């Protein structure tokens, strides 16, 4: 990613397509000069928001409002202009082309936020939170991302980093002046403080699972024999007819995926083709192969049974498939068609020893109980509002930090190992700094910002 900081960049910052208003962002040292070439206004020079027209010098292209932000008090830390234009793609392209012709260049993915990072307007963890906030799927995930963007996660990292840095300084001073031991922290005090740092890191690591769930959602796959009511269950959960439902076995021949907000958790629910003992239909066979593929990617499995009939060879085949798959995920056994006389024998379920929920996809009875069970398994409480968005990069670096701190403590406990303890503590400090974006390799930065949308 070859982002030249000296360039002035421009891009559409609002969603593409027709809308009432679209915002074009222009950032860089020459932003004011470039916009001055195509923006004509009668507003007073001291006004920050100015009304006028975009023109190519011959004719007007649009009536707009331009907001001027002077460096360094801007999102990027540079001179920045936001053009509020009418949201017609034809007009937007004309304005962008005029900006490019007059000295700006198209911004790359996340380049505005990248410049904010380079200009110390935010650290790397906060920049990543910007992307997480934009892509949030639920209100709770947006709150978690905003908490991180507001600096709550960074503050915790800085506190641990500063504590480690102070301990390193004490250890280095101790090594330089071994005869003045009484002037520095005692060994027991150092061990106690490292213990505190370890606990703080462990608490953040424990937040990773929740952050991952809020950011990416939970994949819930519905599996069962043909006509168990899988598609009806999907429709009942969604509250609309998304999947085709008939009395003909094998109606669903492909996976159908939908996402819902369940108590703040994004649930990615997949309806699958039914698995049965014998099938000569090629399309159905291919559908069953996709079912097996979806099961292997699931976070939670809903195994659906028809409670109005006895378990048969198809149920047994699914049980055998799950056993051979050796899945290490929660499986919820759901007895569907509770509105009909029960004929289902629980012997198969007793052997499986899984959570059991009774529902009727037709009437909606038990659907809320099923969703409650999924939320319970996820372990995310909607009443909490202090969640943080900790991503995989942070998790790996926090793990590295934890391992380094544990080795530091072990070395401090041993005799004549102070230099090793100091080295390990420095490793922890480096990992913590990387989370904040200090001394991070360019290829890592390129990877992070390439996931952003253009215009942010």
From Swiss-Prot:
Q: Where is the signal peptide?
A: none
Instruction: List the InterPro entries.
Output: G_TrmE, GTP-bd, GTP-bd_TrmE_N, GTPase_MnmE, MnmE_dom2, MnmE_helical, P-loop_NTPase, Small_GTP-bd
- Provide the binding site for K(+): 227, 246, 248, 251
Residues binding (6S)-5-formyl-5,6,7,8-tetrahydrofolate, per UniProt: 25, 82, 121, 456
GO MF term (any one) = GTP binding
Report any one BP term from Gene Ontology: tRNA methylation
Q: Where does Mg(2+) bind?
A: 231, 252
Its GO CC terms are:
cytosol
TrmE-type G domain span: 217-379
EC number, UniProt record: 3.6.-.-
Entry binding sites for GTP? 227-232, 246-252, 271-274
> PROSITE patterns from the entry?
G_TRME (PS51709)
Q: Which residues form a coiled coil?
A: none
Where does the protein end up?
Answer: Cytoplasm
- Tell me the cofactor note: Binds 1 potassium ion per subunit.
Cofactors demanded by this protein: K(+)
Q: Which UniProt keywords apply?
A: Cytoplasm, GTP-binding, Hydrolase, Magnesium, Metal-binding, Nucleotide-binding, Potassium, tRNA processing
Role description: Exhibits a very high intrinsic GTPase hydrolysis rate. Involved in the addition of a carboxymethylaminomethyl (cmnm) group at the wobble position (U34) of certain tRNAs, forming tRNA-cmnm(5)s(2)U34.
Give the multimer and partner information.
Answer: Homodimer. Heterotetramer of two MnmE and two MnmG subunits.
Q: Know the name of this protein?
A: tRNA modification GTPase MnmE
Species in which this protein is naturally found: Endomicrobium trichonymphae
Q: Which gene encodes it?
A: mnmE
